[in-house]
Amino acid sequence: AHRCEDKGYSCLTMPDHFDDQLAPVPALMTAANVTTNLRIGALVWDNDYKHPAVLAKELATMDVLSDGRLELGIGAGWMISDYEQMGIPYDSAKVRIDRFVEGLKVIKGAMAEGPFSFSGDHYTITHYNGTPKPVQAPCPPILIGGGGKRVLSIAAREADIVGINATMSAGVIGPDAFNTMTAEAVDEKVTIVREAAGARFNDIEMNVRAFLVSITDDAKQAASGIASMLGVERQMVEESPFALVGPTSKLIEDLLERRERWGFSYVIVGADDVDLFAPVVAALNGK
């Protein structure tokens, strides 16, 4: 957290899974407590792991204790291993997304002023006045990421920040997902968002997580190595917004071009890349 803030990063995120990681709520609150301006959020909370009214209370508390620095990332859930290990039914994508849509309504209702009631297929809330209320009224910025048409359309209508993801319908990251990370696939995903958002598109912050980062003077060799590892063509790695490969100067140019093409102004890199990527952050902050 200290490193991120000192090097100019604006937000620290972490996943919400049951594998080898810290629990996001206490970990992110610790990060907020030792920093001043760094924003915090999960990428993303899975709606199926907690009742949304319980999650809303935790998130509102985080926003209060961090003095309004929370980003509310939430999704329908996709990683099948989480569900299998915890004995949570891995329902069809339709059911999980339906439940997520209801969960988002519950979270917004719990954070809004006054009591609210809700009756859906998955959740029923009766005259509940959620407390505390978040500092960022009526709700912290909502981040929804998706790879398929339905979730991207929901994100376009409901989110402040829309994340463009690979398509994870298989429940794992594999060849099928890699095929949806091409520049052409991202063109199609952004078009879905633009059409579903309508007039509000210009108010949305577009987000992408760069999973493949290699800061090197030999961009071609690095891209070839990544392509070989993934079983894809080098050109795909060079053009995909999910990859950042090359020297600092090239990464700056690539990010500016991707902002122009897709609108990406919010780019996430992994913890291992924080130090090497810092000059790129310094060059682009405020631009």
Task: For the regions a language model picked out, list residue spans one by one.
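Active-site-adjacent structural elements that line small-molecule/cofactor binding pockets in enzymes
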Residues: 1-287
